[in-house]
Amino acid sequence: NSVYPLKTEEVDLIWRLLRMRLAVSIVNSTHLASKNKQDPYITISQAPAWKFLENFNINESLLKARLRTVCGMPAVEGADRIIEWINNESSKFSPLLGTDLTNLEIKSLSVENISIPQNPFELTSDEARDIGFELGKRADIWLGYYNEPRLIYTAPAFRMGPWKASNRRTVHLAIDIFAESGTKLFAPLEGEVFTAEYRDNELDYGGVIILKHTTPNKDEFFTLYGHLDPIFMKNLKLGDKIEKGQSFCQLGSPDVNGGWAPHVHFQLALTTDGIEADWPGVADPDDLTFWNAICPNPASLLNLKDADCLYQPSKKQEVLNDRRKYFGGNLSVSYDNPILISRAWRHHIFDEWGRPYLDAYNNVPHVGHSHPRINQVALDQLNKVNSNTRYLNPLQTQFAKKILSKFPSNFEVCYLVNSGSEANELALRLAREHSGKKGIITPDEGYFGNTTGALSISAYKFKKPNGVGQA
């Protein structure tokens, strides 16, 4: 497509042509095998080909949309017209909560900005119910961003494999409005009930409604309202007409809304082909371009500006450029494509989009990143006093006793320092003072620190061409 641009009709045929080509290969190999019965290689690929053709589980509508997106085309027919109409009508839609949302505060639940959940692989029920408490927004009405990477989605449904770190869906495809349970919702525009269900799994939607809407040009689009009180099930049914401004549901409490702090998950979709009523509310960051095309920013339907509700993570290249500008040039950064770390837990680190990486490289995993007991001990002590060893404190000697208890009895004293570089520097001074000698035997490899003394015994530094500083 980049060399010879395809038409939409041609892109839509790719999936059928692919299957046709595979079927032709099977036919050809069968025909050749009938004439060369002693050559098993001819039909070696038939079994996997048949297995694919008979068992593939790929929705054709979604695949068409994916191929269109990859080729830079609108994902669905009429997408541009729908977005243009919604943007032109913005400020005219009925307020979803019956009141203007323009001046409400937008708070971030992103991987960069909050430490919930404490364990990024397991959101607790208390944490889910208290979302916003850490931000000081437990009772107020406030908004949550579209396109925001979050680590609060930890249920098995949010990953694409057997492991807790398997291709997690983290990026929020809706705008959240947090308010008290029982708050009534009013239809932003005229619609028809497409789905009205109660999904009672933990951390699911609870009550959920999908409305179908039609523009004056007869283009259809859909809005989803999640985490509702399922009381609407008593009087709403599929096909019911909902008038603009009509109250049609209310926010559910954690007992009925999937276990979350009361809010509505408000999402826009330009099609339901291939997803029907089972919309992904969050997307894999590596699949985000496609899902942004299917479920674009719904801010205009709330009479808000897209840019105000769109979350922008820290930009890796900008951070890297600033690092090069403000740090010394000899300070290296790992990997040609560096990881922008936003959080860490035990033996995993997470980037700005919530992707997990196994950390088997750094020293911190000796006890694990963000160890809750160690964090709490450090926090408690920082809240009391954080000074140095020129003053008396019983914790210093208690710590020294505990360290010495792990060593042979001829180790009698210890020095408390802040880093390995300082420890090695002090060890050099003590050894030279005690022995009266300067020579040091060290391995050819190994990092001993960044002080002058530590570098002087680091062969990997001074044995390089033009290396200097050997002790």
Predicted regions and their residues:
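Active-site-adjacent loop/helix segments that line or gate small-molecule/cofactor pockets in enzymes
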Residues: 313-344, 363
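Surface-exposed, glycine-biased beta-strand/turn segments
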Residues: 79-207, 244, 294-312
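ATP/Mg2+ or Mg2+-diphosphate-binding catalytic cores
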Residues: 25-80
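Acidic, glycine-rich catalytic/binding loops that coordinate metals and/or anionic ligands
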Residues: 92-112, 234-246, 250-256, 260-313
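Short histidine-centered loop motifs in beta-beta connectors
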Residues: 180, 186, 218-245
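Glycine-rich phosphate-binding segment of PLP-dependent enzymes
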Residues: 357, 362, 366-391, 398-415
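A conserved long alpha-helix in the C-terminal portion of kinase-like catalytic domains
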Residues: 1-22
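PLP-dependent aspartate aminotransferase-fold enzymes
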Residues: 401-471
